[in-house]
Amino acid sequence: MNQTLSTIEELLRIPAPCPGPMGLACDGPDLWIGSYDTCRIYGMVAMQGRVFEEATAPGRPFGLTVTGDALRVVVGDRDDGGTDDRFIRRYIMGKDFKSDAIRCPGGTGSFLAYDGDRLYLSQRDAQVILELDDAGAVLRTIPVPRQITGMVIVAGRFYLVTTESRESDDYRLLCLDARKEEPEVHELASIPFAARSLGFDGTKFWTNCRGENTIVAFAKPD
């Protein structure tokens, strides 16, 4: 953990509705959680901890984001052996996954963010965010100084959970403004656990503490 940055201000922790929570997205007062272990997604009322919807994913779910009345979900192979091609799948809330799929560029990708117009995909090892068109073609590549383990767009800026490497326990919250020709990056806070995914409900951030099967809400740094 970084000793020079202030630590995030935790507001509450709630049990995850599943083991191995990986993906997370906010939809008003509701959370959507994807489980690496069960290969299912769960809709839950955050402050009640009540699951109101769940569905089997067509693979192992990673990052997800809300796009209107649907979710976009990065899905990988269930089998840990062999190749792990990643696809972006569409889940219609209250219904099921649709058959259409967009292959992630290079077959790899982890987390998603949506700005109301375009979809963005992170690639952890490449340390980039890819802006995608509707067909999944790359419109822009945004470099990031650290590996991304969660992201969300708030007021036009990317907020990122990051780490130095897969072996590091130094997790940090970054703000990246990519609207300028040269993206501006600011480190905001240290995160004292291995966080996965990032959502924002309008007032506070949410992330998964996968190792403890909990979901953590924390204050938005000034």
Please place each PLM-identified region on the residue numbering:
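Blade-level signature of beta-propeller repeat domains, shared across WD40, Kelch, NHL, RCC1
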Residues: 196-222
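A short helix->beta-strand "capping" segment at the edge of beta-propeller domains
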Residues: 1-17
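Short loop/turn segments that connect beta-strands within beta-propeller blades
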Residues: 45-49, 92-96, 133-137, 177-181, ...
